[in-house]
Design a protein with these regions (language model features):
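C-terminal edge beta-strand
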Residues: 1-8
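Structural motif
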Residues: 49-53, 91-99, 145-157, 204-217, ...
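Short coil/turn segments that connect the beta-strands within blades of beta-propeller domains
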Residues: 39-40, 80-82, 135-138, 194-196, ...
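Beta-strand-rich domains and repeat architectures in extracellular enzymes and scaffolds
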Residues: 20-49
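Loop/turn-rich, solvent-exposed surfaces of beta-rich toroidal or solenoidal domains
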Residues: 232-301, 309-311
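Beta-propeller fold detector
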Residues: 11-23, 61-69, 105-118, 160-175, ...
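Repeated scaffold domains used in trafficking and secretory/extracellular systems
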Residues: 27-36, 67-80, 86, 115-133, ...
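Asp-box/WD-like beta-propeller blade repeats and closely related beta-sheet repeat scaffolds
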Residues: 100-148
Length: 328
C-alpha cells in the first residue's frame, strides 16, 4: 500500500491592493459616510456632497457625480449592481432613496418618506438594499439612532409595494434598549422568512462599559439570535458585509476602539460563518484561527465621534477561483 500526503492549500489568501487616505484621494473633507463598489468603481458618498468614483483596483480618481439631493448619507449597490444612494431625515428633509441610471446619467427616485408623513428624525442614517431595485422583488431598509426599530419597504419591478408613508416596522427586542448609533442591517435573502444580519452599539462617548460594546447578531423571523462573540472584535463595529463564495459564507467587519476622545485604531476582520456555531468562539478558543480567517494591521489612531464606517465587497470569478475585493 502507498500512503500519499497531499498538501491542502488554504481556502483563502489575503493581500493589500492599495491604501489611501482622504488627502491622497483628493476628498474635500473627512465626512465620507457612504461606500460602495459600483462596477469597476469605488464610490464614496461625501455627506451633503458629491459622489466620488475611483478605480477599484488602483484607487485612481475617475470622475465625480453630483448628489441626488442635499444631506445624502449612504451609498450601496443592489444585487444587479445599481448604485443606490440615500438621504437621512435631518432638518425635516425626509428619508429619500435613489438609484443612479447610467443610461440617463441621473438619479431616479425610489422612496420618499417625508417628515410630514411621520418619518422619524435621522431615519436613513444607515440604509441597505436587497434584490434588484428595478426588476423583481427588492427591499429597502432604513435605520436611525436612539431607537429599537428597523424600517423597511418592499418593491416589485421598481415600484413600491409598501406605501412610502407606511413602512414595515421590525422592533429588534434582543437589543434590550435603544442603540445610540444607527445599526447596520442586511437581509440574508429575498425569501419571506429570510434571516437578517445586524450590528448595533449602545456606546456613549467616554464610557467603556462592556455592556455598551457593539454586537453582531444573526436573527430569524421568530427572533432566534446567533451572536458573534464580542471578544472577537474591537469596541465599536462601524460596518459589515456578509457575502458568499460558492457554498461558503463570510463576514467582513470594520471595527474600531473607543477611548475618551471617541477615537481608536481600526481593523478589517473576516470570519468564515458558514457554520454559525463557530460564532461563539473567542480569540483564545481552539479553532478560532479557522473561524477568523483574516485580521488586518490596526490603523493609526483616528477620531470618529459619529462612528462612521462602511464595508463594500465585490466578487469576480477567475481561472483559479474568485477574487474578492473588500474596501473600507
Amino acid at each position: 500500500n502507498t500512503i500519499r500526503v497531499v498538501p491542502t492549500p488554504p481556502k483563502t489568501k489575503f493581500s493589500k491592493v492599495w491604501e489611501k487616505n482622504c488627502t491622497d484621494l483628493g476628498l474635500a473633507s473627512r465626512n465620507n459616510t457612504g461606500l460602495a463598489i459600483y462596477g469597476q468603481y469605488l464610490a464614496v458618498q461625501e455627506y451633503n456632497g458629491p459622489i466620488y468614483l475611483y478605480d477599484m483596483k488602483t484607487g485612481a480618481a475617475v470622475k465625480t457625480i453630483d448628489a441626488a439631493r442635499s444631506f445624502m448619507m449612504k451609498a450601496r449597490t443592489d444585487d444587479a449592481g445599481h448604485l443606490i444612494t440615500s438621504r437621512e431625515n435631518i432638518y425635516g428633509a425626509g428619508f429619500m432613496v435613489f438609484y443612479y441610471s447610467e443610461a440617463d446619467q441621473e438619479h431616479k427616485l425610489l422612496l420618499d418618506y417625508t417628515a410630514g408623513d411621520g418619518c422619524p428624525g435621522d431615519l436613513g442614517y444607515n440604509m441597505s438594499v436587497a434584490g434588484d431595485v428595478t426588476s423583481g422583488t427588492a427591499y429597502i431598509y432604513g435605520t436611525g439612532p436612539n431607537d429599537m426599530t428597523i424600517y423597511y419597504w418592499k418593491l416589485q419591478d421598481g415600484q413600491l409595494v409598501t406605501p412610502a408613508n407606511q413602512p414595515n416596522k421590525l422592533r429588534y427586542g434582543p437589543a434590550g434598549s435603544s442603540w445610540t448609533a444607527a445599526p447596520a442591517i442586511q437581509r440574508a435573502s429575498l425569501a419571506d422568512d429570510s434571516d437578517h444580519y445586524i450590528s448595533y452599539t449602545k456606546w456613549v462617548n467616554g464610557n467603556s462599559d462592556e455592556a455598551l460594546k457593539s454586537r453582531f447578531n444573526i436573527f430569524t423571523t421568530s427572533m432566534e439570535v446567533t451572536a458573534l462573540n464580542a471578544a472577537a472584535h474591537e469596541y465599536r463595529l462601524l460596518g459589515f458585509n456578509v457575502f458568499k463564495v460558492e457554498n461558503d459564507t463570510y463576514l467582513a467587519l470594520n471595527d474600531q476602539g473607543a477611548d475618551q476622545w471617541a477615537g481608536g485604531g481600526a481593523t478589517l476582520k473576516v470570519f468564515d460563518i458558514t457554520n454559525t456555531s463557530k460564532m461563539e468562539l473567542g480569540p483564545d478558543d481552539d479553532g478560532y484561527g479557522d473561524f477568523c480567517v483574516f485580521t488586518s494591521d490596526m490603523s493609526a489612531w483616528g477620531q470618529n465621534y459619529f462612528s462612521w464606517g462602511d464595508v463594500a465587497v465585490y466578487k469576480e470569478a477567475t481561472s483559479t477561483g474568485y477574487d474578492v475585493y473588500i474596501c473600507l
